Amino acid sequence: MFSRGNQAAAMLLVLLSGLAAGAGYAAQKVQGWGKVSMHGAIIDTACAIAAGSRDQTIDMETIPLGQIIRDGQGMTKPFSIELVNCILERPGNKSDWKFFQVTFDGYAEGSLFGVQGDARGVALKINDSSGNVVIPGEPLPMEEIIPGNRTLNYSMTLMPNHQPLKAGAYFSTVRFKLDYF
């Protein structure tokens, strides 16, 4: 009825059909399942930093070179760090939390934060909401810890750095840390 070649082909077709049907059945069984992964940390600090504040990207936008020359600076963009679940009490014999300091760090260019990329002649200046200029690596003045949640507001401005200006894309990474006392 079937030649040896046709018998082998027919047998292979039957086996593959069985595998495909089994895979379809297995896929139907698994569709009702899922997985949730999580992570977190327990910290010994007065406040936690809100998830949306830990890793931010600020779009400084595209501006004409002439605007920096005319205005003496580029655009200013606001950003903030949200502190959550702040407490004053510490467990055990440790003294209560009272103050904190914020320190920003990154590629320093004098009192400014340097940029990388094709653009030249510019750097970034950061100010806090009290008008204090943020110097890379130097802590800002101490502030009192207030229980609950709190938003720390800052602004970032593109500034000339007294080098020849050159158009191009730029980027920078600025890290921050909080120390509690």
Label each PLM-derived region with a short phrase.
Residues G18:
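Short, Gly/Pro- and small/polar-rich lid/capping loops
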